[in-house]
């Protein structure tokens, strides 16, 4: 009986060519797995393609709700944004894909897992760290890093497929390299490879339009959160995945969430990409607006710092680590009272605050108002400032004694 290998399969040219390559070079029975995180139409005809290329079977694992509830929500609660821009759409999906690959490998009794991530990117790290953490005994085959992999272009991959009786309508023409799930879609390649070039948004965008082409009239949206988790949109209770889907429609319509970023990859190089994250951008902004009202100053500052660390951890593929569990435990503690309603207006790429309420709001109008109130005496500030500024005053006095001008 042949040994089995589980292949992370997308249906694209790379992973399609890997099926006969695995059979030819390793004599494996190939079991394909496609993990559906919300790729939409990209799944059409996938099973027929995998079987036609020599796979013994294809698993399509629908994990959209698990992805949103167990991976997206923690990142939203953390305010996890990599290098101030990237909302981690690809990064946070990879550990879940790795988890499902391992589950199928165990079910099938497979001895190896194969992926088609390139040797220059981050995904090879994310997949392999996940597999190593969950199944250290399973062999990992990275096709693009394997000495037996000789294909180096779309043309050579197409020719290899044809030589093995696989005739599919793949084009040798270059196109954008894209990754899509319910949270985002990324675009790399073509004119984007030169940072001096402006993106061809008319040809590139999938989920929405540029702000210039958005409607002239804004649209109001109301979102409710309970303990940092979105629970309803415009008064309608929804599960998280449905909220994200609806926000994608609204955000795309109004030109929200398009970023052009040069990011620092884990492997050391810089890469340029355009990301569309309309729903995610709205959700992150709404959550932050609510936190501004509820968290005290020290907790807000520490959580912001932790959010940056959490983003780096997710970006680097370290989801299945004790550190992620510890950081997430801290973040969840901060979310106990992040409950309330956020109203905002979407208008030509902007998310404009239109009102925030919470039963746990720390904003007290009688204290914050410029008018006289009972809870705060303006004279109290004098003693506070004298103490708060004492070190400044002492330093200045000492420098004056020594005839030193510091500023």
Please provide the spans of the model-predicted regions:
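Nucleotide-activated chemistry modules centered on ATP-dependent adenylation/adenylyltransferase
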Residues: 2-407
């Amino acid at each position: 009986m042949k040994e089995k290998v589980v292949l992370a399969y997308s249906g694209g040219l790379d992973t399609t060519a890997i099926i006969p390559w695995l059979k030819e070079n390793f004599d494996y029975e190939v079991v394909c797995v496609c993990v559906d995180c919300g790729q939409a139409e990209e799944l059409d005809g996938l099973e027929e393609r995998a079987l036609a290329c020599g796979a013994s079977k294809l698993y399509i694992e629908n994990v959209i709700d698990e992805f949103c509830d167990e991976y997206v929500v923690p990142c939203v609660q953390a305010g996890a944004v990599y290098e101030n821009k990237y909302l981690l759409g690809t990064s946070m999906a990879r550990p879940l894909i790795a988890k499902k690959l391992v589950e199928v490998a165990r079910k099938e009794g497979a001895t190896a897992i194969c992926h088609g991530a390139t040797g220059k990117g981050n995904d090879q790290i994310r997949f392999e760290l996940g597999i190593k953490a969950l199944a250290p005994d399973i062999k990992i085959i990275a096709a693009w890093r394997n000495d037996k992999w000789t294909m180096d272009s779309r043309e050579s991959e197409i020719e290899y497929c044809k030589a093995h009786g696989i005739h599919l309508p793949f084009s040798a023409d270059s196109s954008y390299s894209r990754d899509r799930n319910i949270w985002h879609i990324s675009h790399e390649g073509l004119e984007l490879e030169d940072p001096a070039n402006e993106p061809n948004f008319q040809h590139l965008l999938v989920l929405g339009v540029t702000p210039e082409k958005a409607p002239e009239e804004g649209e109001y949206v109301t979102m409710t959160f309970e303990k940092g988790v979105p629970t309803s949109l415009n008064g309608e209770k929804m599960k998280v995945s449905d909220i994200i889907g609806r926000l994608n429609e609204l955000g795309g319509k109004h030109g929200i969430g398009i970023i052009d970023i040069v990011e620092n990859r884990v492997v050391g190089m810089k890469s340029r990409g355009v990301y569309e994250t309309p729903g995610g951008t709205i959700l992150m902004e709404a959550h932050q607006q609510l936190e501004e009202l509820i968290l005290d100053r020290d907790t807000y500052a520490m959580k912001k710092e932790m959010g940056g660390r959490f983003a780096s951890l997710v970006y680097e593929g370290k989801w299945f680590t004790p550190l992620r569990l510890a950081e997430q435990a801290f973040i969840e503690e901060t979310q106990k009272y992040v409950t309330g309603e956020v109203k905002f207006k979407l208008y030509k790429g902007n998310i404009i605050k239109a009102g925030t309420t919470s039963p746990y709001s720390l904003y007290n109008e009688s204290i914050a108002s410029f008018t006289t109130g009972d809870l705060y005496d303006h004279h109290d500030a004098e003693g506070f400032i004298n103490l708060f500024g004492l070190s400044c005053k002492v330093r200045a006095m000492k420098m004056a004694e020594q005839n030193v001008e510091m500023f």
